[in-house]
């Protein structure tokens, strides 16, 4: 993805889990 959810993407890689954030578009 990109933009504001860059932190969430990093967390996904560390936890090996996919997390969805509301209001943010994940590419």
Swiss-Prot record:
Q: Does the keyword Protein biosynthesis apply?
A: no
Keyword hit for Nucleotide-binding: no
Q: Which tissue types show expression of this protein?
A: Expressed by the venom gland.
> Where is it localised?
Secreted
UniProt-recorded Gene Ontology molecular function terms: calcium channel regulator activity; toxin activity
Disulfide linkage: none
Which keywords appear in this protein's UniProt record, sorted alphabetically? Calcium channel impairing toxin, Disulfide bond, Ion channel impairing toxin, Neurotoxin, Secreted, Toxin
GO cellular component terms, alphabetically, are: extracellular region
Briefly state the modifications made to the protein after translation: Contains 8 disulfide bonds.
Domain of life here? Answer: Eukaryota
Family per record:
Belongs to the CRISP family.
What task does this protein carry out?
Answer: Blocks contraction of smooth muscle elicited by high potassium-induced depolarization, but does not block caffeine-stimulated contraction. May target voltage-gated calcium channels on smooth muscle.
- Indicate what this protein is called per its UniProt record: Cysteine-rich venom protein tropirin
